[in-house]
From Swiss-Prot:
Domain of life, source organism: Bacteria
Protein's recorded name: Threonine--tRNA ligase
Domain TGS: 1-61
GO molecular function: ATP binding; metal ion binding; threonine-tRNA ligase activity; tRNA binding
Amino acid sequence: MINISFPDGSVKQFESNITAFEVANAISMSLAKAAMVAEINGELKDLSTIIENDCKLRILTAKDSECLEIIRHDAAHIIAEAAKELFPDIQVTIGPAIENGFFYDFAKDKPFTPDDVAMIEARMHEIVKRNEQITRELWDRDKAVEFFKSIGEHYKAEIIASIPAGEPITLYRQGSFIDLCRGPHAPSTGFVKHFKLMKVAGAYWRGDSRNEMLQRIYGTAWATKEQLDNYLFMLEEAEKRDHRKLGRELDLFHFQEEAQGMVFWHDKGWSIYNTIEQYIRKKIRKNGYTEVKTPVLVDKSLWEASGHWEKFREDMFALETDDKTLALKPMNCPCHVQIFKQGIKSYRDLPLRMSEFGLCHRNEASGALHGLMRVRSLVQDDAHIFCAEEQITDETVSFCKLLTEVYKDFGFTDIKVKFSDRPEIRAGSDEVWDKAENALKEAVEKAGFTYTLNPGEGAFYGPKLEFVLTDAIGRQWQCGTLQMDFVLPERLDASYIAASGEKKRPVMLHRAILGSLERFIGILIEEYAGRFPIWLAPIQVAIATITSDLNDYALEVQKALIDNGVRTDINISPDKINYKIREFSNQKIPMIAVIGKQEKENKHVTIRRLGTTDQEVLSIEQLIALIKKENEKYL
């Protein structure tokens, strides 16, 4: 007999050599019917797994989050089976589960058409209805290679041949289809009910551009119809909000081939950029930061000393001049250490909070560039806090408080924290890491956050916190970071005089709230769908006249607004007022000041706010006061 422990704390005895499915069936037939996989001693396994010894067991169903990846992995096998049934001459290659779905790569002479994809999706539904049993098989490697060669699946044979000899090969069979896979999988194809094929793209075999191009079909799969519908709605909404599309429509910025990954900011986009910078500058000054400016182009000797040359050389832009190698800085930290080192620093000078809107360049692959979200030239709201070990907790708490205030001002209140602790390869002693990790954990908890652990994902020089925002349509964006560094002050010989009179190394906290301003603006464009709040909008008030004889008064209103720092636009053309209002609304200007005969006589304007038909009559002074009040909350 063996003892099996369950999540509710109960322990039950069973005959040895019982399968996980049989255990589920012994508990209840309904559980066995819903069961997808088993978690045995913390590891996901097929329900057919034989249990020989005492263990901890969870039976998982589609309601458990762990099963979502199983559903997606099953869907990848189902798409491959469907494609092979419809197009027997194609070859299958790889098909993993990915975030939000799955894909499968196929070798096919002619491209898949939209009709082909629709046929494949329909056949997938047929395979689900068949409820084909999915079984795991152990094969000898060489026999598996020969088998796949014999059925014309040469890509699959190549993958298996690259596995070391003697390693067991696991194949999964469903219907007439068989595929190489580690598993686990659900017991049958009937568990994958809610999916949709999304698009076809090219992909090189093994990700190598020297190899042949394959066709990749992407799909999404979910545990329930509601989840699938919500995801498809989110994608539809995301397409409407795409910052690249809105950037063109609202005349904010553009990109072009001659400067890949570099932003051409237009007047309105640059207004948003400068307003955000002004806002952050006010915040950091209030929180005791100094602001510095460091060179963009720096000799490689500094990057060698800091360690960046060895680790990031491929991502840096370098040039030769006067027998020297210079590099555009990819980050600001080594330069900030140089400022810290000017003059003798005492423990009384700490913490020293040094900020910079630093212009950085990173040689991102052209295929990875994506609008404002991934660029080669970027400015970070970067800062480094030089402090003593005993100040780490307080500085982290202060930073978390500042970060929360900033995110709230931009409308983000759902903030998640990820804590990345020590990696296997790291600098510093375990004692130092213990102190650092405990200080960060204590600070996060003091700041009122809970965190999820990313084991082993810290940098080699210290643990880090990542702050993740959830936007209006449920997407998550990692923006803020706080990273502890024991190594750079050592490498660049930064020190301060402690109270005891001895020299000590400061701890360096790398921190950013927005990350890159470019990316954050991209996120904001999509968060607001282009409808910026008044304080941030590039044009705060648009003025529109009903008839041309009101133009002089309209210009008088515009001058008063401009003189008081209000960003304005005006249309005093002969066009109809409804056309003017529609055009300004399409530009997503938050307030439109309509001027008619009565407004001129009373020295008023009639305000229409974006997205409403409500009207409000204000004097020029009242309008200015209203805008100033909004601005002063943030600027």
